[in-house]
A protein has these predicted regions:
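Bacterial N-terminal signal peptides that target proteins for export
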Residues: 1-11
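C-terminal motif of bacterial Sec signal peptides marking the signal peptidase cleavage site
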Residues: 19-23
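Sec/Tat-exported extracytoplasmic proteins
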Residues: 37-41, 93, 106
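A short acidic-to-branched-hydrophobic micro-motif
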Residues: 77-96
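N-terminal "mature-domain start" segment
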Residues: 24-68, 137-139
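A short, solvent-exposed beta-edge/loop patch
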Residues: 107-139
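Short, surface-exposed beta-strand/loop micro-motifs that present aromatic residues
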Residues: 61-78, 114-122
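Stable alpha-helical elements in mature extracytoplasmic
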Residues: 29, 33, 94-98, 102, ...
Length: 139
């Protein structure tokens, strides 16, 4: 009986961990992410032509890029820029292959903002980075 309870407990912990990790990522559909960001008053660009064409020249199958920015005030009243960039690839293999290229883009953007920054993260066929608040708004 003790073994059963331990296994059940570990299983529940694993399920909770998966749910927590999955809730950190933006929406897996570009249109849903765009709608959520617009609702949160972000300026949003959903690009399915120019940036994907550039990535295709590099050998990557990118379908959409959602970029959003918003100027806000922090707790001390300072002006801060919230930013999120979400790359939607055709499949997980393309996302993994392009991850280092996305990291280069993220470094450039990280220098522009000193806010709570989330480094590039791979989630299924998406790669995203930006500030914590902007990523949360993209759900």
């Amino acid at each position: 009986m003790k073994t059963f309870v331990r296994i059940l407990s570990l299983t529940l912990v694993a399920v909770m961990l998966c749910a927590t990790l999955a809730s950190c990522a933006p929406a897996s559909d570009p249109a849903k992410a765009e709608a959520a960001l617009k609702e949160a008053e972000y300026i949003v660009l959903n690009d399915s032509t120019i940036t994907p064409a550039v990535f295709k020249l590099g050998g990557y199958d990118l379908t959409n890029v959602v970029t959003a920015t918003k100027t806000a005030e922090d707790k001390e009243g300072n002006t801060v820029v919230e930013l999120v960039v979400i790359y939607y690839f055709a499949d997980k293999d393309n996302a993994e292959k392009a991850f280092s290229k996305v990291e280069e883009d993220a470094k450039e953007k990280a220098e522009q903002t000193k806010e709570t920054w989330v480094a590039p993260t791979l989630s299924g066929s998406m790669v995203y980075f930006g500030t914590k608040n902007a990523i949360k708004a993209a759900k």
